[in-house]
Amino acid sequence: MDFYKLDEKLKELKRKRVDVSIKSRKLADREIQEVSANRKPRVYSMEDVNDADESVGDTESPEKEKAFHYTVQEYDAWERRHPQGKTGQSQRGGISYDQLAKLSYEKTLRNLATQTQNSSKQDSSADEEDNKNVPKKGRIGKVQKDTKTGKITIADDDKLVNKLAVSLQSESKKRYEARKRQMQNAKTLYGVESFINDKNKQFNEKLSRESKGSE
């Protein structure tokens, strides 16, 4: 028995196994992308994977990219313009309304952080001007380190904390009301509360009809 030839065959089989695994992974990734875009998956051949011009990657839809820059107010306006949209998923980009609301909420927080930073700078300048000749009476500065324990103490600004709390409550209420209206519209239009895609919608409608017929 020629062990050298056996070793070469084993190496060749390993290389083929790796190639097949890579091709299978590319095919699976491509099909996942098509399914997420609500398109019917195509039938592929192994030769398609070898196409030099093919590039497979994680790409985001333009609608999802725009959603990252929406504020809650812009989200509400967008929702009013799309009352017929799907409950579980938008028609084009595959982004759910929950994700859209989350992105809108995150942008609102970023805007609020910028506003509070500017407000903090203005308040600090005003305090320094008013208290130039006023000695500090045990007031903790912005950041203070205990030399014995090494702990850092940061003084809270009550004004900014209260402003943040009020803003978060207001934005949370707006997002809740927007989501509630959207769910009510979907229930009125389709008779089902939510669905992921067209097949799921048809299945939910069928269940709804059967449940009404059995009553």
Swiss-Prot record:
This is Pre-mRNA-splicing factor SYF2. Belongs to the SYF2 family. Residues 111-123 have a biased composition (Polar residues). Present with 1670 molecules/cell in log phase SD medium. Belongs to the NTC complex (or PRP19-associated complex), composed of at least CEF1, CLF1, ISY1, NTC20, SNT309, SYF1, SYF2, and PRP19. It comes from Saccharomyces cerevisiae (strain ATCC 204508 / S288c) (Baker's yeast). The keyword Protease does not apply. Keywords: mRNA processing, mRNA splicing, Nucleus, Phosphoprotein, Spliceosome.
